[in-house]
Regions:
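N-terminal nucleotide/polyanion-binding subdomain common to many enzyme families
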Residues: 1-84
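Structural motif
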Residues: 36-38, 64, 157-161, 184
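Short glycine-rich anion-binding loops that position phosphate/pyrophosphate groups of nucleotides
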Residues: 40-44, 162-166, 189
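A short, gly/pro- and small-residue-rich
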Residues: 53-59, 168-186
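Conserved beta-alpha
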Residues: 70-149, 153
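A transmembrane-helix-recognition feature enriched in membrane-embedded lipid enzymes
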Residues: 71-72, 199-239
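Short, flexible loop segments at boundaries between secondary-structure elements
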Residues: 137-141, 180-215
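Proline-aspartate-enriched helix->loop->beta-strand connector
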Residues: 150, 154-159, 163-164, 180
Length: 239
């Protein structure tokens, strides 16, 4: 797995899915906790303006690249030659887990109906994964009560889906109290896992054009303006 430092943020690029599975297997075996991320261009830009986010992504064990324009930016700045095939979207997370072991997962975030559907679909598609518990994202009990609930469930992996920067702030403040082996934020992934929000066609995913599908699936001029700023990666490439 190749590792790079881009604007003070460490980035990790596995050579293929097999290596990704190996990385997760080692993290699950590790006696220490691993906080990781799947970072896209929009989040990368956000951390440049948010000191807490910046420190968060500097401190994570691995920041896997989820976004074609972030790959293009490091290509231009670091002389690499990555393509859309080198993205590792957080939405595909369960494909990265080792097939030869049972993994317990706790989901925190999203709506109740999405969590219920996500549990059924994930466990059906990935027999080695068990969603052992979940908590919807709009609970007021996100302090010690929630920490105790998560720890009592004894998950191998905790996925926090509250959107950036809320999920990162919550993880930053609570990670030392949690006993999960792997912890990360994953935005709106539960909505996709539930089937209530459609993903792009496979050919668009392979080409790194999933952002374009999402843009038109939930179009707004504000979202369009934001994507246009990210499109050619120029803001990412600035020193």
């Amino acid at each position: 797995m190749k590792k790079y430092l881009f604007k003070e943020i460490p980035l990790a690029v596995p050579s293929d899915r097999a290596e990704m599975k190996s990385v997760f297997s080692k993290m699950l075996d590790d006696s220490s906790q691993s906080v990781i991320s799947f970072i896209n261009p929009e989040i990368f830009l956000a951390q440049e303006k948010n000191p807490l986010l910046h420190e968060y992504f500097k401190s994570t064990k691995y920041n896997f690249i989820d976004g074609i324009n972030l790959l293009y930016a490091i290509n231009k700045n670091l002389g690499t030659s990555y393509s859309a095939a080198d993205r590792y979207p957080g939405t595909d997370f369960f494909d990265y887990l080792p097939d030869d072991r049972k993994v317990g997962v706790y989901l925190y975030g999203s709506k109740i109906e999405n969590l219920e559907n996500a549990k059924l679909r994930i466990e059906s598609a990935h027999p080695n994964v068990k969603i052992i518990e979940w908590t919807f994202g709009y609970t007021k009990f996100d302090g010690d009560y929630l920490i105790e609930k998560i720890n009592a469930a004894k998950p191998d992996i905790l996925i926090v889906c509250k959107g950036c920067p809320l999920q990162e702030q919550w993880i930053w403040e609570n990670k030392q109290k949690l006993n999960a082996k792997i912890i990360f934020g994953n935005g709106g992934a539960v909505d996709f896992w539930s089937g209530n929000t459609k993903r792009a066609p496979e050919f668009m995913i392979r080409l790194g054009l999933e952002w374009l599908f999402r843009l038109f699936a939930s179009f707004s001029f504000k979202r369009l303006a934001r994507q246009m700023k990210l499109l050619n990666g120029t803001r990412l490439e600035r020193k």
